[in-house]
């Protein structure tokens, strides 16, 4: 028991010493913020009204080990469009959305594939913003379910400094940390595919119930990447997505 208690203390001290938010702004945090600002000022080529909403994830966001450079080689930034949203299949569309979403939002249902964690996104609703008694809400219009429209992404490097890295588009930079840019679709609900995670048995009572509740309330994201058995398939490679819990 004493040995187990010692291990518990070592793990706890490591997490407390390395996984808190940085108390001071570092050069790497500034570079991450710079990448976020650059992505946020861009607009999708097929939708000038849409905004990219950035979120820094990965080691730069999670650790404050200094110096950071030996441990981190790039900045991971996820971006989702302000005009797109994913919801679990069978869930009703939301009537209210966070302020960063646009006046119109396309809502895609998350449909399971044959591989756990990998899904398809099927266009289901169009939400349009309206004001009722001073309250901003969204009116819902349903698409024809007889003609399924699958959301697809064809990610191609835009320059010699870019390459595909899993679900990310890797941008090499010789002066700053390189950028791993992961386009995604925001899901405000916790997906039923991970329904057992909040009640899963946890050693050492970590994460605690408050942290679990906070993670679940943040929902998840859906990133464009196909299962390894489907990446050579012309259809599946473009239409298959994967659930991501990086914002946790």
Regions found by a protein language model. Give the residues of each.
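Non-catalytic helical "accessory" subdomain of NTase-fold nucleotidyltransferases
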Residues: 1-248
């Amino acid at each position: 028991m004493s040995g187990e208690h010692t291990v518990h203390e070592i793990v706890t001290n490591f997490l407390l010493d390395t996984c808190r938010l940085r108390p001071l702004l570092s050069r790497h945090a500034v570079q991450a913020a710079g990448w976020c600002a650059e992505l946020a000022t861009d607009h999708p080529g097929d939708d000038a009204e849409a905004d990219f909403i950035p979120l820094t994830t990965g080691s730069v966001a999670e650790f404050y080990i200094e110096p950071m450079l030996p441990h981190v080689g790039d900045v991971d930034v996820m971006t989702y469009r302000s005009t797109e949203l994913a919801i679990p299949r069978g869930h009703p569309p939301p009537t209210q959305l966070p302020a960063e979403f646009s006046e119109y939002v396309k809502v895609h249902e998350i449909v399971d594939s044959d591989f756990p964690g990998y899904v398809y996104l099927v266009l289901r609703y169009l939400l349009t913003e309206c004001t009722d008694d001073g309250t901003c809400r969204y009116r819902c219009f349903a698409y024809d379910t007889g003609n399924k429209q699958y959301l697809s992404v064809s990610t191609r490097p835009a320059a010699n400094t870019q390459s595909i890295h899993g679900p990310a588009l890797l941008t090499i930079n010789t002066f700053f940390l390189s950028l791993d840019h992961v386009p995604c679709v925001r899901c405000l609900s916790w997906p039923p595919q991970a329904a057992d995670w909040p009640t899963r048995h946890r050693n050492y009572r970590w994460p605690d119930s408050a942290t679990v509740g906070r993670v679940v309330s943040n929902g998840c994201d859906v990133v464009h990447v196909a299962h390894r058995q489907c990446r050579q398939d012309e259809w599946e490679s473009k239409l298959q997505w994967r659930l991501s819990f990086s914002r946790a």
